[in-house]
Amino acid sequence: MELTGVTSQSIFDDNAADIKLSWVAGLEGADRAFDVEFAREATSAADLVGHLNLIHPNRIQVLGKPEILYYQRLDDEPRKRQMGELILLEPPFLVVADGMEPPPDLELRCTRSSTPLFTTPVSSAAVIDHLRLYLSRISAPRVTMHGVFLDILGMGVLIMGESGLGKSELGLELISRGHGLVADDAVDFVRLGPDFIEGRCPPLLQNLLEVRGLGLLDIKTIFGETAVRRKMKLKLVVQLVRRNDGEFERLPLDSQYLDVLGLPIHMVKIQVAAGRNLAVLVEAAVRNTILRLRGIDTLRDFMDRQRAAMQADVVSRGQGRLL
């Protein structure tokens, strides 16, 4: 996993309010990060944070009530040895959860070794779940793509195409028909799971849509709160093409896909020409994609009916010759 620039300070700043973290020791270790080799070999965020475990000392160690009670029951020598092993391998930081007070000798060791020590009243399980989700998000593969990203009938749709084909005008038409804007011009996509790509708008462009001749439009102000979305799952790409595009296929026999962050996304191509109602065509494409995701393929059904009709015709002709 790629965790460049992720330090104990950045993790604390991003999560302190959500899980009520307090920094009680090891302030000098603010720039401490994951071991590079350990982070590279990690296959998921579950490898990076968990309950106290000396077998995996390089990860974020969370100590809940059971761990603290176990630590307190140990004799001096075993306790010193175990904590010495843990501190020696420099974990990014330790978290004492469940509202427990960190043992004084643990706090002293963290101070001397510049190992960040956090406390929180939140349960250890909730802390681990929250940090795993956070680390998954910041380390996930991401890309910025050009286009207009919309919520159409509950489906995340990215409209792409050459400059000047009317992507923003089409987006404005769809918004006026009750659909929602996620982002215009630049869309940030992040792959959060094996089949899950989420798209968001960069903060600088939030709620804005640029239309030639009109300039920048604040969609939230013009159309209201329900006309914008904070994020959507990417499910469909609509590619606008010029009418003279030689690669355009009128009846594609196979589904078309666009590779986004290693995940194949359904794609449809729509020719741009005078008199065509592109908004209606996009809505129809979305409805058809919804049917395909449910296992209903209109073109395949038609081909099956046509094949059955041709076979029946051949059989009837053969019987006619026999008569």
UniProtKB/Swiss-Prot annotation:
Active-site residues are 146, 167, 185, 250
The entry's free-text remark on domains says:
The Walker A ATP-binding motif also binds Pi and PPi.
**Residues that, per the record, bind Mg(2+):** 168, 210
Classification via InterPro entries = HPr(Ser)_kin/Pase, Hpr_kin/Pase_C, Hpr_kin/Pase_Hpr_N, P-loop_NTPase, Ser_kin/Pase_Hpr-like_N_sf
- Source gene? hprK
Q: Where is this region: Important for the catalytic mechanism of both phosphorylation and dephosphorylation?
A: 209-218
This chain belongs to the protein called: HPr kinase/phosphorylase
Catalysed reactions, as listed in the record: [HPr protein]-L-serine + ATP = [HPr protein]-O-phospho-L-serine + ADP + H(+); [HPr protein]-O-phospho-L-serine + phosphate + H(+) = [HPr protein]-L-serine + diphosphate
Q: Which NCBIfam families match?
A: hpr-ser (TIGR00679)
Its UniProt miscellaneous note says: Both phosphorylation and phosphorolysis are carried out by the same active site and suggest a common mechanism for both reactions.
Report the protein's function. Answer: Catalyzes the ATP- as well as the pyrophosphate-dependent phosphorylation of a specific serine residue in HPr, a phosphocarrier protein of the phosphoenolpyruvate-dependent sugar phosphotransferase system (PTS). HprK/P also catalyzes the pyrophosphate-producing, inorganic phosphate-dependent dephosphorylation (phosphorolysis) of seryl-phosphorylated HPr (P-Ser-HPr).
Q: Which GO terms describe its molecular function?
A: ATP binding; magnesium ion binding; phosphorelay sensor kinase activity; protein serine/threonine kinase activity; protein serine/threonine/tyrosine kinase activity
Signal sequence span is none
Q: Which co-factors does it depend on?
A: Mg(2+)
Can you tell me which residues bind ATP?
161-168
Swiss-Prot/TrEMBL keywords: ATP-binding, Kinase, Magnesium, Metal-binding, Multifunctional enzyme, Nucleotide-binding, Serine/threonine-protein kinase, Transferase
Q: What family is reported?
A: Belongs to the HPrK/P family.
Describe, as the record does, how this protein assembles with itself and its partners.
Answer: Homohexamer.
GO biological process: any one?
Answer: regulation of carbohydrate metabolic process
* Species for this entry: Cupriavidus metallidurans (strain ATCC 43123 / DSM 2839 / NBRC 102507 / CH34)
Q: What is its EC number?
A: 2.7.11.-, 2.7.4.-
Specify where the region named Important for the catalytic mechanism of dephosphorylation lies, as residue ranges.
271-276
